[in-house]
Amino acid sequence: MFLTRISINHPVFATMMMVMILVLGLFSYGRLGVDHYPETDLPVVVVATTYTGASPESVESEISRPIEAALNTIGGIDTITSESYEGRSIVVVQFEVDVDSQDAAQEVRDRVARLETKFPDGVATPQVTRYKPEGQAILSVAVSSTSRTLPEITTLATRVINNRLSVISGVGQVSLIGSSERQVLVVVDPDRLGAYGLAVSTVIEAIRGENQDRAAGTLISGINQRIVTVEGRIANTSGFNRIIVAQRNGYPVYLSEVATILDTGAEVTSLANYQGQTTLGLHIVKVQGANTVEVASAVRREVSALNAELTKDNVQLTITRDNSRPIASQVSQVQRTLVEGGVLSVLIVFIFLNSWRSTVITGLTLPISVIGTFAAIYALGFTLNIMTLMALSLSIGILIDDAIVVRENITRHLQMGKDPVRAALDGTNEIGLAVLSTTLCIVAVFLPVAFMGGLIGRFFLQFGVTVAVAVVISLFVSFTLDPMLSSVWCDPQSQKTAKRGFFGQLIERFDQWFEGLASRYRSVIYFTFDYRKTTIAIVLGMFVVSLLLVPRIGTEFLPPPDQGEVSISLEANEGASLDYMAAKVGQIERALREFNYVSSTYSTINSGEMRGFNKALVAVQLVHSSQRRLKTAETLGPIRRRLSRIAGLEISVGQRSEVVGSIKPLQLSILGDGDEELRRISDHITSVLAAIPGATEIESSIEKLRPTLAVRVRREAASDLGVSIATIGDTLRSLVAGDAISVWNSPDGETHDVVVRLPAAGRENAAQLRNLPIATARMDDNGKPIMVLLDQVADVVESTAPAQITRKDLSRDIRISSNIEGRTLGDVVADLKAAMTKMDIPVGFRISFGGDAENLTESTAYALQSLAMAVIFIYIILASQFGSFIQPIAIIMTMPLSLMGVLLGLLFTGSTLNMFSMIGIMMLMGLVTKNAILLVDYSNLGVREGKSLRQSLADAGAVRLRPIVMTTLAMIFGMLPTALGLGEGGAQRAPMAHAIIGGLISSTLLSLVFVPVVLTYLDAFAGRVRRWVPSPTGSNASAQHDGSDKTKTPACALTSQDQLGTTIM
């Protein structure tokens, strides 16, 4: 091969090429970002619209539905979902993964902009944003103090802490949870307002008018000019008391006479608890593309510096959640398995070659290939994440394979008595085409994997490309560095007459035993030739029996990672207050502290995905895996059973998926129009699901009604008194919800809202609402507006309304979700689907699965498509190598043999069929062809030398047994550290190695006897077909086929000189 010849003739040039690869790789490694999973630009666009005061029904009909209809005509949409709350609409448009997210967002903006003129008055401009997975917090910090009030802590956090953290490189946003901003609160007295005949709007306008500076122009005198300003800004909070809001009987009415002015904190609308104590929570979000580990490390350093500075102020910052910790831990663990796998693989080489020089020559392939791959990872814009590092760790045994085969063949030629240069050239040339084919087969497998569709395709893109690049670099090193070193670095130990030390003699005895094994294997091949049908029947029987194991191996989308964190979502009845929810969260936290493996708890109410006073999320950090006997998944059951004893809450315990973002793996939607029928179907499915073993914590999003107070204006009475609906609405909003009507500039230069509102004790029940004074348009004899009570112009009725209305794909949507315990997701879904086939679903209604169940179905389909493409590509490569359409069939028939080992490996280790193990199976398809290629390639060489097919196959088995066993053991031992699943997250990666190792063992053992037998059948078949295919005159195909096994040239082992007529089979 020309690469080999150039390298041997120019050893310095070959060395410098390796140095260049190492330099580029090391330089790139230092600049690679570190993340858990590959960053994905998911084409998901969110349209958020505010319609203050509107009921969920109004929001649905006037906002959500028109937006859905307008967006539904955009091309490339996967699903449209909407949620209509009181005063707010959220429409989420999920596009197909191949759609550019920026283009999708712009298209949505254009469509929504055309609708704005058709929206009712009072609808705010819709906000169109792209969903970004990296928008999740990488760190959470609790700010606490034993002497400062919450408003003071909030001010400190806003002015100092937030600013210091926000300027850190890579930090995109710092959001506050449980904050209480300082404000000037004008607490109005409704009785005094009524007594003075003052509308709340009069008070508001007075404050706005008096608390402002007004520019009055400029005075110009010669060359000088001065700006004239009317200074009306209130200098301190006490100054608000002197604002005159009206004149009564010739006397001013001051604001202090109808309201109390408080310098206080805003009413808390969210809460954060750490270890049972109320704190101010800071959630830090990184910018897209930033190195998660580096950003988190910088934030930790800054937090330490802030703690040192704020100790004198009695303020403490504590990191409550650090999502970079499991990332750094798992990346470190994968790197360690990579090194361990490399050491084990090299050890296998030493045992078989019994030469430390040969081991070094072969082992150099590993660091060069791995480090060189870092350059490609950097050039392609990838990061060091679980996918890329796992690709390298699983490829360790594969990367050394080419070097093993090349070096072993060179050693064999050295033992023939050839000089090192000739042995390096001949040995590489003889095996080169087979090595090239095996590498191309692996690349052929991962090309389709790299371009799988769906969400999972985005994640495995980097895995597939990394494996493909790594094996190509290892092939290059095997064809250049290994032959060059073999030619210039003489290895006396490669000779059988070399003197050995103690360990060398032990290995030599092993070598002698292996030579005997190879000889016995030759006899086994001849034996199978005599019992070909029996051999085929036994192998096929074993394959069929192994398929019976499939039902015993569960299926799931992704195995849960053991990251040492449990997520608990809590939901109380609609209408529950923040205080009620805080008390319930306290109960949950106290119960969790009963478990000795719980390290800390961090709870948030009305924050993030759990929006609403009745919703909370508790993040439970477990002690390190070395300090507990149970895996994270095993702690869920005890925690679930303990928390179920706490009444008044719907509780869901699970592990949050970083891929799909949900806690509950089983989710389905019931779609259709007709609330009663939707409710009936939902109740039926919920009851069916509850009866299925393994389904737990079942929830339905069937419209939950929240208590409301409906103010129904009596129009005739209101009209007679001159009271408009707008007046009533504005008055109630200001008094009940509170209005930020102005801004106060404090002496320290900060600005704070001025808010008008009723006291908390004055807005607790309907009776207080009925007695609120409303100013009419009529005046009394003194010119004051006549005041009436709300009860005189409106009825205040206790009622209920849907808390939210959910829609999907233009239909009403009820979502049912469930956790899984004690069984796999696939088993539960299969039982549910079987039960649903017996259900009577009316026309116009349909059921669709979501969450992990949908991802599992979709990803399995994509994996099967990619597998089919991989088999086709492998056939193309093999047919091109062997110049035959028949021989590749024998090699491809070894692929199913690996499934026996896959199923047994998964069964014995307790692993499931999931996306990791499925990718392992695909990877296996490229690996199992390696052994058969080595056999067939050497067999064809014997045939071309005039040997019979049976003799050449027997010789090939005896000669190629050593490299076959070496490469197989190198791959197995290279993947062994990953298969053990040690460390955090190791259990999630292990199924891929379990599948590959099991498949390698079964395919190696069976293909050694199966491939030779199949080739004899295919040769006979090709011989019969050749009789019907015309051959050019003079072709060697015109030779008589006498049926003699010892003298014929097999039809399926055709040389490169054969013409089309003889090679078509």
UniProtKB/Swiss-Prot annotation:
Residues 1-33 form the signal peptide. Keywords: Nodulation, Plasmid, Signal. SUPFAM superfamilies: Multidrug efflux transporter AcrB pore domain, PN1, PN2, PC1 and PC2 subdomains (SSF82693), Multidrug efflux transporter AcrB TolC docking domain, DN and DC subdomains (SSF82714), Multidrug efflux transporter AcrB transmembrane domain (SSF82866). The keyword Signal applies. It holds the Pfam family ACR_tran. One of its GO terms (molecular function) is xenobiotic transmembrane transporter activity. One of its GO terms (cellular component) is plasma membrane. Residues 1032-1052 are annotated as: Disordered. The keyword Acetylation does not apply. Residues 1032-1041 have a biased composition (Polar residues). Belongs to the resistance-nodulation-cell division (RND) (TC 2.A.6) family. Involved in the production of Medicago-specific nodulation signal molecule. This is Nodulation protein NolG. It comes from Rhizobium meliloti (strain 1021).
